[in-house]
Amino acid sequence: SLAGNLEGYVIGLTYKRKQETSMARHRRTHPFRDSRQDIETARDIPDTAQTRAPSYKLAFADEAFMEREELRPVRLQLELLKPQLLMDEYGVESTVVLFGGARIPEPEKKAQAKTPYLAELSRYYDEARRFARMVTERSLAMGGKRDIVVTGGGPGVMEAGNRGAQEAGGISIGLNIVLPHEQAPNAYVTPDLCFNFHYFAIRKMHFLMRANAICVFPGGFGTLDEMFESLTLIQTGRMKPVPFLLFGRAFWERIINWQALADAGTIGPDDLKLITYVETAEEAFEVFCAAEGACGDQTTS
């Protein structure tokens, strides 16, 4: 809606001003010329055979050089660093992660679903939307820096999460990735917190680095990949345990036989306790708040 978009714009503008203030605090104090000055100077140099040669370009401003195979370690570092810096400047302290299928339509459009079962799953669009709204309202009551909703920034469940956060008047994060069939990010991601990735691995790190809870809705290969990597990190002690909520017991038990893994001994009986099934936004919110301390304690941090 126009009101929702305007509210989201105002929230984004407020945070952008905070970001500019933060950047001002981090301006350099050393006497050396900075990189931006030299980029501008290099644009105005005389046009000669030497200055047109690729070798003459400043290394950090040379796209062809940055795309070389040998520069992969640098590109990995940049993809880790850029979102980290921008989220820090926005004051993002922690997140609530929403994983879920891009093909799940909102209920009003379920007639367009590719299969009858996808149409049935459309109710999880509303659950994700309501849950994100509840989490964001709680976050705003605590100062708006903790438990920021983060999604993959695409359609389906991801759109629902960002949409619910915007409807609550808060910000949300979208971690997109370049895919052959990918379209633009959904319109509900806070623009200054909408990121684009080349590396799946770095993208998944940013999903989990600040996570206070992980919520998994029905989805496909991407959702399964994100779910199993998150579970593996928690199971192996590489990540602290956080509430791990699976929306839709019937869906998950239909495609994954967790008990069979335990019976086979390939996972331990206690590993089954890592996940909690929920059906509604309200149920998930109650579990999340209980794990965080108390739903009623919403003091500003």
Across the structure, where does each feature detected by a protein language model lie?
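Short, solvent-exposed amphipathic alpha-helical segments in soluble enzyme
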Residues: Q166-E167, E229-I234, A260-A264, E292-G293
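Short, Lys/Arg-enriched N-terminal segments with co-localized hydrophobic residues
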Residues: S1-S22
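Phosphate/pyrophosphate-binding betaalpha-module
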Residues: V149-T151, P155-F217, F221-G222, F228
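C-terminal amphipathic helix plus adjacent low-complexity
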Residues: R25-R28, R33-E40, F288-S301
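Solvent-exposed alpha-helices and their adjacent loops that cap or buttress functional pockets
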Residues: D88-G91, A141-G143, Q166, N186-V189, ...
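C-terminal functional extensions of proteins
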Residues: L246-S301
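Glycine-rich beta-alpha loop segments
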Residues: T29-P46, Q50-A59, E63-L175
